């Protein structure tokens, strides 16, 4: 794949596109999903030089042991297992790919040029806003000190939420290109063999993921994780937990967060209540409040946020998705709905696009579990 060969920024772009299930056809998104796990690896020597440059010290000054082979690599960084020299604690060390300092601005410029050229030749596919969003979010994601602050904040927020099996690795210290945190590991949420071999109920995992990410969207003052995909979530067997959830949900990669205004949270929640109640006048009212969607474009927007054919939205969005519905959506995309979606979402507030991005998680939890959580949420009584 060209994005994989061209390196970090383009892999990051591909990962972002893999999660755009609210906009792109499943066939496109599925093509980009392997980029969640296929990323470049920087040499140990280059990392040693980076640490020396950034801190004035060597890796051996911080760690008594440091595994040179990374246990994981992402588009912007890779993770090594190490042992802290002063405490003996086993930790995960997230280290930015050193060449990003030099190449990131050039790659961003090329991305903007490519999307601008695409708009010129295919004006109906204007996704220049995606390059703009990447240009805004990338500097934040490249600041690991900020990521450390984000992780600490979301860890503190969820410590007050009862019965949520969420684990956020504790941050020990952070620099702009180096992040040291406690070592926490698990398996991808779609590793069904692991779940089954440890008697982890798939529906319980679904329910936990639904609670966690919907809390981020609808919870008062909750921070919103804006890069949710299967590579950033891990499930770990934990028989010590009480109740039905005999597992932990580990959430990684806290580089990109947004705060949702309370008024938007409430209007978006009321939009979903209207969808579940099949109350079309209220759906249209709150669609305009959250995204300035007019009457003409509402059916398209309703399909985008629910992932369902609009005729289903008008009846009961909780009903099982039929083969006929899947074929209808596929046919509509081929008949120009994709171009209409691109143009529509280019006008939607950016924070709404980031909220919609959580739709990527729909492959990990059943829709009826989302509904069950949603109706019981405290925000509905606010």
Go through the PLM ranges and name each one.
Residues 1-217, 235-262, 273, 281-382:
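Broad phosphate/nucleotide-binding scaffolds in NTP-utilizing and phosphate-metabolizing enzymes
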Residues 220-230:
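Catalytic-loop of the protein kinase fold
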